[in-house]
Amino acid sequence: FHGCTVPRGWERMYPNYVGSEAVLASENLIFNQHFCDEEAFNACLHPFIRNAVGCMEFGGTFLNKRLNRGNNGGTTRRTTDVFQLATAVLFQNPIQNYALAPNNLTDAPQVCLDFMKQVPTTWDETRFIDGYPGKYAVVARRHGKQWYVAAVNGTKEVLKLKLELPMLAGQTLSFYNDDKELQPQLQTLKLKADGKFQLTLHPQGGAVLVQDWKTNEKEMGAYLFTYFKDDTHSLYFAVSDDGYTFTDVNNGQPIIAGDTIAEQKGIRDPHIYRAPDGTFYIAMTDLHIFAQQKGLRNTEWERDGAKYGWGNNRGFVLMKSKDLVNWTHHVVRIDKTFPGYDEIGCAWAPELVYDEHAGRIMIYFTMRMGNARNMLYYAYVNEDFDGLETEPRLLFQYPDATKSAIDADITKVGDKYHMFYVAHDGTPGIKQAVSKYINRGYTYLPEWVDPEPKACEAPNMWKRIGEDKWVVMYDIYGINPHNFGFSETTDFVNFKDLGHFNEGVMKATNFSSPKHGAVIHITKKEAEKLRKYWKNK
């Protein structure tokens, strides 16, 4: 074995020592056809022998058929493309690397390129599923909350395997496998409730099962609108079957009182997020702007308004539920979580989104230090959703250094992230920034999105179920009584004004003057359960 060694505890010298080959390295596939002929066999040894004692330096995942720079000569690869995709999950490297070539960007199957764009390079958990040295190997790895199951066949015969995957029981999966012509194909399947799955592996072929981390829109049949009101600083739910007419589930009364969950005895800006595993998360601003009037504190603000500004606060309220009825809640104080944030002026309008690259939930929000201008920041929440794992980092700042940007809302469409936010540039209103990355690189667009002559804030974008239409809604606080406005788009360039609640096609049947909220998709069953629960309450 090239660079052969035995474990000597060198890992204790990290970061000066990262790893070593100590394996039949992948360049041998280029040097000699014999190694290409035996690639599948050797790949089914690595998990049992080399990776059993640690990471290896191995540049796997060849997508060239001919292993030279031009893909037109030299040795010939015997394994299938999906076999190669599986090795991106199967092999354990200290710093993950792949043997892709520049020409692969134009000649490799698109399904393979899309897989390689999203496959994680670090793993949080590994489980051995099945295998036999030199014959086949099936390994499951978890990144964040998403599982990948990789399988390779080291033989020249068809293998039929009976797998047990309890962590994926009943879930929808993306299934990468070889078709009859040994070409890569991507299918969608739903695993049985018992987690059992029969897998067929073609000779020197492979397969990858990927937990679907994206909500299946076809299963959705209703909409849930979360909002708050200034007079109560509490949380409200409204439901719609068609995305046009919304009815409050508790007849205009709070479902959770702000004084029961927040340090400042009130919440604002509730944002609800539905994770693909069915868990619901809500993030809210821990702030009551009328606490003095309500007799909840002796001063207008929690701290000196001259020093820390209007509406100063220091944290959020985070809530989590499996059924939209029973919720856990936690207060998260940024100043108590990270050193150096004692002078934080505000932490407003938190929203949640899943970062596919990081494999975890990102929270992004408005923040300022002292009474300086407001800017947009992001961090990552922990797995229990009761705290922050990473220190806030800058997400976006308005190009005019004298102006504030607040209330971000991020929507991914295709391979782009569209961030709508409020620009305090003249009359406050909604603008858009676009990036290829979720947490950086947003390009400023100067056009105003909303048609409102009066001040508005709190943009939230949501998709109409079964249609290529998106609705951006916003809180028009500059009118009296305040109301929500709506605009619709198909291209994120042109926006059609739908008017306000009860002044156009959008209706609020049993509530008025909602403030800063969000809309998500829910199933018809979930909508009916909410209606029934609160009717009986």
Language-model regions, residue ranges each:
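Histidine/acidic-residue-rich catalytic or RNA/ligand-binding cores of hydrolases
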Residues: R8-S20, V111-C112, G429, N480-F484
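Glycine-rich, aromatic-lined ligand/substrate-binding cores of catalytic
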Residues: R66-H143
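Carbohydrate-binding surface patches
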Residues: Y132-A169, Q204-V208
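Solvent-exposed beta-strand/loop surfaces of large extracellular or lumenal domains
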Residues: F175-D194
